[in-house]
Regions:
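N-terminal cap/lid segment of alpha/beta-hydrolase-fold proteins
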Residues: 37-72
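Catalytic histidine-centered segment of alpha/beta-hydrolase-like enzymes
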Residues: 226-237
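Alpha/beta-hydrolase active-site loop
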Residues: 91, 120-139
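Short beta-strand/loop motif that positions the catalytic acidic residue
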Residues: 189, 195-197
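The serine-hydrolase catalytic nucleophile loop
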Residues: 85-97, 206-207
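Conserved alpha/beta-hydrolase
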Residues: 98-116
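Gly/Ala-rich beta-loop-alpha elbow adjacent to hydrolase catalytic centers
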Residues: 147-156
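C-terminal motif of bacterial Sec signal peptides marking the signal peptidase cleavage site
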Residues: 22-24
Length: 264
């Protein structure tokens, strides 16, 4: 089947990018930086820890919530990773590192109410994700792929046509979560969609099947076990990583991938 990206006008909104330098003090606090040209935090080796991130960022949503995120790698193809309920952006760090090594820019972030992000949990995920997409585009992304786990997958599916991304993938997505409804979105969505779910993860196995049936353009993988969302990586890490990277590569322009320069 030939996928055709749906062309929809994005809602106009202003995203305020608020960035500062991380202090190097032992307390790990954030020191303010008044430079209007700074676009990143500077991390010490201790700050980076096991995440492998190259930047820690803070950006603002349309309704003035401050969200914290981590940027991995560089390049003009950006992957925005959205976490599931009860977890935070760190659940995506292993895949973010892997994808950045391939040559993609990757953004993980905490939905409002999670981690250091302000606001009430499990509300207005659409605005949070919209702000995340605006951030990567403001800093050079020419193509964007959304990937989410559970509620993050539902939000990614619903928002994908509105922000005109290249493709969207979801791990164990419910058909709806709060005000976010993925089932309604897929009925008219022509953007490439990838669904991954465990075969014994009720009700999410059934939800993923419903999304697959309703969607016009879908790849569907049902894996053994009962793990949910990013917990699927614990049993199927290599397989899921391979599926995701293959999907991303199929629907993006590989000439935009960052290539590490070598000395001649």
């Amino acid at each position: 089947m030939i996928f055709k990206q749906q062309s929809l006008l994005r809602n106009a909104f202003t995203v305020v990018l608020t960035l500062a330098l991380l202090s190097a003090c032992a307390s790990g606090g954030v020191s303010s930086n008044n430079s209007s040209t700074s676009n990143q935090f500077v991390l010490s080796a201790e700050d980076i820890g096991e995440s492998g991130a190259t930047e820690i960022i803070r950006f603002r949503t349309e309704d003035s919530e401050d969200l914290w995120g981590s940027v991995f790698g560089q390049g003009e193809i950006a992957i925005v990773l959205s976490h599931m309920r009860g977890r935070d952006q760190s659940s995506w760090f292993p895949f973010a590192r892997l994808a950045s090594e391939v040559g993609y820019k990757v953004l993980t972030f905490d939905f409002r109410g999670y981690g250091k992000s302000t606001g009430t949990k499990n509300t207005r995920m659409d605005r949070d994700l919209e702000a995340a997409v605006a951030y990567v585009r403001a800093y050079g992304a020419k193509q964007v792929v959304l990937i989410g786990a559970s509620m993050g997958g539902t939000a990614s599916i619903e928002l994908a046509p509105e922000v005109e991304v290249q493709a969207v993938a979801a791990l164990s997505p419910p058909t709806s979560f709060g005000r976010v409804n993925a089932l309604d979105a897929v009925k008219s969505m022509l953007i490439p969609l990838l669904l991954i779910v465990a075969e014994n993860d009720p009700p999410f196995t059934g939800d993923a099947r419903s999304l697959e049936t309703a969607a016009a353009a879908t790849q569907f993988f049902e894996l053994p076990g009962q793990q949910h969302g990013t917990n699927l990586f614990s049993e199927h890490s290599d397989q899921i990583s391979g599926i995701l990277l293959s999907f991303i590569g199929r629907w993006t322009d590989d000439s935009l991938i960052a290539v590490e320069e070598t000395e001649s």
